[in-house]
Amino acid sequence: MVRKIAIYGKGGIGKSTTTQNTVAAMAHFHDKKVFIHGCDPKADSTRLILHGKQQVTMMDTLREKGEDECTPDKVIEVGFGGVKCVESGGPEPGVGCAGRGVITAITLMEQHGVYEDDLDFVFFDVLGDVVCGGFAMPVRDGKADEIYVVASGEMMALYAANNICKGMVKYAEQSGVRLGGIICNSRNVDGELDLLQEFCDKIGTQLIHFVPRDNIVQKAEFQKKAVVDYDDTCNQALEYKELARKIIENENLVIPTPMTMDELEELTSKYGFLD
């Protein structure tokens, strides 16, 4: 049975990079059949898998050609490792609601039965926080079974992660969605690993993997490739291989217990953020 996973986190934390590198490792090292559904108006959730190809988005297709032309064969591309890719896209800048576009795109893909098409995993790469109903859809309506939050040892990254957990708690009972863990996309800040571990303990989940910072990620991006596509023998490729393995084998799925703002500030001040 296909597992549906949504990746959340603060804007700019590296969700799309982490998602694509993890998915590439799943396909390359673990022989998994994976589908990425980009849920960001920037439509950059699949560019490394597709070697920089600008994918036609579902919302552009709907606007320009209509729903009859917005079919899987017109909007899905296949990239590295046989990974299938689609981008929701969004409205024209300053017009309309991008969150509504996510709802429309996911619903259309479901109607076409795409997510059940002999897959092991579907990944929803979701924009930012869950303050908007459209971007909360994978949580609210049970479109995803598991949530992973990308964070770092920075105050605003933890603040966003905690807010995402609050959104999960609101909808977890009705949707059945659960938190699979926190992924640390390291920023090399002091005490980062210890801080993330303590944060995870307090919200009742696991630090599923600590991804170290490595310039090879940027080097691979310059070549428009995922790390495992660029060099599958390097240390960072093995980190993504390990993260992929942990997600594949993960059975520790929980409803989190978010911290209060006072508790979060107390935690971060312990590590010197509020000195």
UniProtKB/Swiss-Prot annotation:
Q: What keywords does the record list, in alphabetical order?
A: 4Fe-4S, ADP-ribosylation, ATP-binding, Iron, Iron-sulfur, Metal-binding, Nitrogen fixation, Nucleotide-binding, Oxidoreductase
Which enzyme type, at the first EC level?
A: oxidoreductase
Kindly provide the PTM information from the record: The reversible ADP-ribosylation of Arg-100 inactivates the nitrogenase reductase and regulates nitrogenase activity.
The UniProt entry, under CDD domains, shows: NifH
Which BP terms in the Gene Ontology apply to this protein?
Answer: nitrogen fixation
| Cofactors named for this entry | [4Fe-4S] cluster
Q: Which Pfam families match?
A: Fer4_NifH
GO molecular function terms listed in the Swiss-Prot or TrEMBL record? 4 iron, 4 sulfur cluster binding; ATP binding; metal ion binding; nitrogenase activity
**What reaction(s) does this enzyme catalyze?**
N2 + 8 reduced [2Fe-2S]-[ferredoxin] + 16 ATP + 16 H2O = H2 + 8 oxidized [2Fe-2S]-[ferredoxin] + 2 NH4(+) + 16 ADP + 16 phosphate + 6 H(+)
Q: Where ATP is bound, by residue? A: 9-16
ADP-ribosylarginine modified-residue sites: 100
Q: What InterPro entries does this protein's entry cite?
A: NifH/chlL_CS, NifH/frxC, Nitrogenase_Fe_NifH, P-loop_NTPase
Q: Cofactor stoichiometry and binding?
A: Binds 1 [4Fe-4S] cluster per dimer.
Question: What quaternary structure, including any partners, is listed in this protein's UniProt entry?
Answer: Homodimer.
Similarity section: Belongs to the NifH/BchL/ChlL family.
Which HAMAP family does this entry report, sorted A to Z?
Answer: NifH
Q: What is the name of the protein in this document?
A: Nitrogenase iron protein
